[in-house]
């Protein structure tokens, strides 16, 4: 079992045991890349659209006669080779960008990310993180006790006060276990996780 320090708000530190299979995995860059690209691809709205030569507005008149001008032959102004013409092989909203990753691979990739964060001292465990009011000022004062910036806070469940107090703060994200994703974990300089969230992550990812 791996031991990680768990800090309380008053500065006390207690070592807690965590699962090797979740927090002590060998870093697998290829697997992490696969689950990140899958997440980003599945998040695409797929609404991009371009017009082909048959969809561009304009006359279908031939621009000049076929022979005798010395110039290359040409048809309508919607010719894809001309400026303002249609596009060859235009993108359509019917494209499917979905990339599937098996559940076992996704869980292994998330464990790899958590292990690497702990290895690089970017994962900070705390006893709990709660605020008594929705005022952002009090939330920032509490966060200042841990001396962290650009941080993602993972809790077992987000209470309304914590969510409302933190939502307008730049470079801060508060999320519960069910909503964590690989891109967010890799985007922040520090990841703060509560003790209850550690237990829940172990039960979900093992």
UniProtKB/Swiss-Prot annotation:
GO molecular function: rRNA binding; structural constituent of ribosome
Pfam families, sorted: Ribosomal_L4
Region (Disordered) location: 47-71
Keyword Metal-binding: no
Alphabetized UniProt keyword annotations: Ribonucleoprotein, Ribosomal protein, RNA-binding, rRNA-binding
GO biological process: translation
A Gene Ontology term for the protein's cellular component: ribonucleoprotein complex
Taxonomy, superkingdom: Bacteria
Keyword Ribonucleoprotein listed: yes
NCBIfam families: rplD_bact (TIGR03953)
Description of how the protein assembles with itself and partners: Part of the 50S ribosomal subunit.
Family stated for the protein in its record: Belongs to the universal ribosomal protein uL4 family.
Function according to Swiss-Prot or TrEMBL: One of the primary rRNA binding proteins, this protein initially binds near the 5'-end of the 23S rRNA. It is important during the early stages of 50S assembly. It makes multiple contacts with different domains of the 23S rRNA in the assembled 50S subunit and ribosome.
Protein's name in the database: Large ribosomal subunit protein uL4
Species assigned in the record: Nitrosomonas eutropha (strain DSM 101675 / C91 / Nm57)
